[in-house]
Amino acid sequence: MFRIGQGFDVHAFEEGRPLIIGGITIPHEKGLVGHSDADVLLHTVTDAALGAIGEGDIGRHFPDTDPAFKDADSAKLLEYIWKIVEDKGYILGNVDCTIMAQRPKMAPYIEQMQNRIAELLHAEPSQVNVKATTTERLGFTGREEGIAAMATILLMKK
């Protein structure tokens, strides 16, 4: 049996915060705003996994009104959800991710992101695809106000 899930997330830039995407800290003058560490890519993968197993979304499991998740490491949140995925008897088929950002350029960090996500999902890097695009200076990402990401995941019954 196969299950498919989709995730989407957006975070605005803010000075004085680190920029963490896909579990990798990227040098940039601004980071992303969020209750947790605001890792827009790991949030989309988490939401995609939750959607695939019919368990709602990241906000249901880790509400931004709960102080326990203030500045939480998104990798830890994904690990928690991935245990639920595995407990339900699923493994990763593949996950395909897209980051939408005008700046900074993501290309130098894509392989590291893929490796980190594969590690978190107990999978091979070949099962994880991360790509990045600009929005040709259109919209909030084009104006460099923030970053968006989306992911589609395929789970397979063990």
Swiss-Prot record:
Gene3D superfamilies: 2-C-methyl-D-erythritol 2,4-cyclodiphosphate synthase (3.30.1330.50). GO terms for molecular function: 2-C-methyl-D-erythritol 2,4-cyclodiphosphate synthase activity; metal ion binding. Keywords: Isoprene biosynthesis, Lyase, Metal-binding. Pfam families: YgbB (PF02542). Pathway: Isoprenoid biosynthesis; isopentenyl diphosphate biosynthesis via DXP pathway; isopentenyl diphosphate from 1-deoxy-D-xylulose 5-phosphate: step 4/6. Homotrimer. Belongs to the IspF family. Involved in the biosynthesis of isopentenyl diphosphate (IPP) and dimethylallyl diphosphate (DMAPP), two major building blocks of isoprenoid compounds. Catalyzes the conversion of 4-diphosphocytidyl-2-C-methyl-D-erythritol 2-phosphate (CDP-ME2P) to 2-C-methyl-D-erythritol 2,4-cyclodiphosphate (ME-CPP) with a corresponding release of cytidine 5-monophosphate (CMP). This is 2-C-methyl-D-erythritol 2,4-cyclodiphosphate synthase. It comes from Lysinibacillus sphaericus (strain C3-41). The lineage of its organism: Bacteria, Bacillati, Bacillota, Bacilli, Bacillales. The gene is ispF.
